[in-house]
Amino acid sequence: MSIGETIHREFIHLKLLLKKNFLVSIRSYFSTIIELLSPIVFVLIFYIIYSYGSAVDYSNVSYEQNLPNCIVSVENRCINLMFSPMNSTCTVEIMKILAKNNNMEIYNYPTDTGPLPNLENTIGFHGGIIAMDSLNSTEQFILAHPNVTLAVVDFENFPLNFTINGVKPNDSLIGFNDFYDLSFNVLLNLSTSGGFIEPVDYSIPVTTSIQKAIYDFYAINNQKQIPTINFDSTQFIEYSSVNVVSLFGGLFYYCAIMISFIFLLYKVAFEKEKNLKQGMVMMGLSRSMYWLSWVITSFTIDLIICLLLIAIGAICKLPFFLGTNFLVLLLNFFLFAISSSSMAFFMLTFIGKTKVAIGIGMAFFIVGSGLQLTFNSLGSLIFQIIYQTDSNGAAFVRVILFILPMFHFSKVLTDINDKVQSYPTSQFKISDLNDNLDGSQYGMDYLVPTTGQSLAYMFILVIVYLSLSAIIEYALSGGFSFKTVKHINVPHFDDQDVANATNRSLDPSNKSPFIIRGLSKTFNKFLRPSKSVHALKYLSLDIQEGTVLGLLGSNGAGKSTTIGILTGIHSPTSGDAIIYGHSVVKDIHSVRKITSVVPQDDILWLELTAMEHLHLFAELKGIPVRERDFQIAKVLEQVKLTKVANDQCSTFSGGMKRRLSVAIGCIGDPKIIFMDEPTTGLDPRSKRRIYTLVKEIKKDKVIILTSHDMHEIEILAQNLVILNDGIMVCNGNALQLKTKYGEGYSVQVIAKSLEVIPEIINFVTSSLPYCRFLKQSALQLNFGFPINTDPKIIVNFFKRLESITKDENNNLMRDWSISHSNMDDVFIKVSNKPKLQ
């Protein structure tokens, strides 16, 4: 196949799978609506909590007499007190005494601090008092830098008799509002940056310190009349819900996106559990296009969910969404969503059961929610601890958390929250992605990645997880095995028919369309070679065109492994099969073009119609458009499903689903058809239809049929192969096998109780020469004896059986019957035949 043909085939497969995913999503509208509406529901719940404000319960605090020292929280600086106006002589004199009483320095704005809005010279301040020119300047700084200043005092009025060293100063605040009062306002910081950090009300110590400074001033200046002191207290900025945003915001955004993670695990695991993926691969589907279709589908759903999440957040006017650049929001949510989906694809290379998928998905959801709550509650502090430079423990935690997309997602949320908590004054812009977050506090140095780096880490996880998924899937499908045909020495077979079939298949001049030569398969146990399973051992045979081969064997005999190798699901350990000139080892793609499968498990999606299934597989098999409708109509009529062609498979009975699977296997006029128990679950009438169909289509084909119904095998198969423990133990038609392995006559006896079974076995085997006990099924016992047994002995035996069963006091048997040996008897005997020497 040329490169152009390969690309075209891959594109067709991708288009088909995307169409299938779209139709299944539309028809499964209930689950699709739940998945897509999850962000709206979670954000609305959060909005209700947000609207009720912070749930922080402020506790009682004891204060010392002096002004308390500030503690560094969100920035590498903190300021005890800011005051204004600095051009008021009276104000400055009072604040000098306050600074002296509390051993603090006064810094003037802007000469000592640097200009607004950043006041760069204050970086590294741990305490002190800053003199501002006006209350307006002070408020600008507070809005830009919340949680940095404990309080602000703004003086409004001094009494007319206010003097400094006996001299009345030239101050516009003297007698400005009242002739006799000294008035000032105190602005308090009651906002907080973390859910576990409760704000402290410093109104009492701040006011007490100011009053003490005023009293000291009057005492120093020998003024006996102390004025009436009036003050108002106001919170800096009323972040009524800042704790709710910090504590729960990220949790709800996380949950809104992780719902799609659980849905993805379930949907893909469902297709694997129902063998839908494997069935399509056996019909020629490209494995890489299967996974690519799911990547495109899941990433598209992730994008829709992220856009809905951002839209509902903006509609609810949540500061997080209004104060953050749209591109930053989209990058954060979308990268988290697709990195989580990529991690899901990595897990799905090992997960094949829906219960396991849901369990793992819920475990990640719950554990991740706990981590998210912890990260958001501690804010930037937790990342400073994790990214500290001198801790081996922190380095170990970083390595573990790095592989989790939720860790980087939480980091970005925290960075954004630190900026937008004072929205609208402060917003998160594109330029903030590169802000330096390194620093040192609490005795530790830390190198925290920028917000942009955290986004890049999530993108790296997308690449890593998808690459690992592709590599593991390729390895599990045998992609890394060297495509060469290995041969082993021909073993010795006791059965002459098996030996002849083996020698015939190995003959280089054999021109049969279907030749199997020394096919073997060993499933090795990693690190436990002694536990390796030899599933197939040197299977060799040839099949002529127009033949139905019955492949028989008990469970674990090697039937499924044989079909898996011939359809490319497994790679053989040694040997090869040549199918119409194409090697299954070297050219499986060409083999699949002429091969079709009716698997034991129906390859059906309940959401699709019979017609949609047939169109899907017709295009998958490469049937030309001009022939497609005719082929579909033909197979629908053959399995009598024409009237329900446009009904969804969810409305079909088990028999109808099975007939549709047979129709799918027959479409496209394949040269080879593998039928794995095609009539399972069918009523007798439907079985006859399938029998007729098989007889009609076998003319120019090779059909390999497996079944546990020996009557069905006798009707359909011209040649039978029985496997036992991976070995071909007999090869021939039904008459040959019954002649060779049959017991002649078969006697069935139904015992009255389990206790009398040993007595019945002894009675029958002693009454008939060379009689053998074959099997027991509950109370039914089967015996076989040679066809050349003396008729007199047989007649006498039957008379004794008849007299026993007619005796009302008989406690041995209820009934008995006799028949010629059938394929069931042959199968039982052959299954116990000595194995390969």
UniProtKB/Swiss-Prot annotation:
Keywords in alphabetical order: ATP-binding, Membrane, Nucleotide-binding, Transmembrane, Transmembrane helix, Transport
Biological processes, Gene Ontology terms: lipid transport
Membrane topology: Multi-pass membrane protein
One Gene Ontology MF term: lipid transporter activity
Gene Ontology terms: cellular component: intracellular membrane-bounded organelle; membrane
Primary location: membrane
TM region positions: 29-49, 244-264, 303-323, 326-346, 356-376, 393-413, 455-475
InterPro entries referenced in this protein's UniProt entry, alphabetically: AAA+_ATPase, ABC2_TM, ABC_transporter-like_ATP-bd, ABCA, P-loop_NTPase
Protein residues bound to ATP: G553, S554, N555, G556, A557, G558, K559, S560
Gene3D superfamilies linked to this entry: P-loop containing nucleotide triphosphate hydrolases
Subcellular location: Membrane
Segments forming domain ABC transporter: 516-750
Pfam family for this entry, one: ABC_tran
PANTHER family linked: ABC TRANSPORTER A FAMILY MEMBER 1-RELATED, ATP-BINDING CASSETTE TRANSPORTER SUBFAMILY A ABCA
Protein family according to the UniProt entry: Belongs to the ABC transporter superfamily. ABCA family.
Name of the protein: ABC transporter A family member 8
Organism (species): Dictyostelium discoideum (Social amoeba)
Gene name per UniProt: abcA8
